[in-house]
Amino acid sequence: MGAWGITVRQSDDGLDLLDTIVAEQLRNVNFTVFNVSEAITLLNQTIQEEIEQYKQKPPSKITDFYISKTLMHDFINAALLVAECLYDYYQTGELVVYDYIGENYDPVEYHIKNFIVTKADLQPLLAELENVQTPDHWKYQGWASEEILKQWLLHIQSVYQTLKEHL
């Protein structure tokens, strides 16, 4: 798992999901505020729309697999991504994101120092952080080695604890 790290923010899926937040939410507010509830809703709607598009295709094992494994897993990755964004904000006082612009997709760095988050936003994120720590969860089982699994668990537990402190 992961394009180059253990966090969802470092995975291909996480980067795609974060790009959706950048393009659809953060650009609209000139990168001044990250609204957790809006980000969760946006990601869930985007994933659901993609599922609906795939359901319009002729049934096949590949389509069924893509919907049941890849797209359904994106709901979990979306929750973990938003939790990691909050974690970064709580740890550093800001969230650093990149917007890729122009023909060459040149990265422009933004520092978001304002978050809108409620206790109601935190509950489902904490539940998902707890769920993925279960040994029979696909996310838990997906690591290549015991060492990487331990690093990931420490990360998830740290995110969980930090968010729980803000409940």
Please state what every model-predicted region is.
Residues 11, 41-50, 75, 139, ...:
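Gly-Asp-aromatic-enriched flexible segments
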Residues 74-140:
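Amphipathic protein-protein interaction modules
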Residues 27-70:
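Short amphipathic alpha-helical segments and their helix-coil junctions
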Residues 24, 89-92, 166:
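Residue-level signature of the C-terminal ends
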Residues 7-10, 32, 71-75:
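Helix-start/N-cap signature of alpha-helical segments
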Residues 1-26:
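Short, extreme N-terminal segment that most often corresponds to the first beta-strand
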Residues 119-167:
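Low-complexity intrinsically disordered segments
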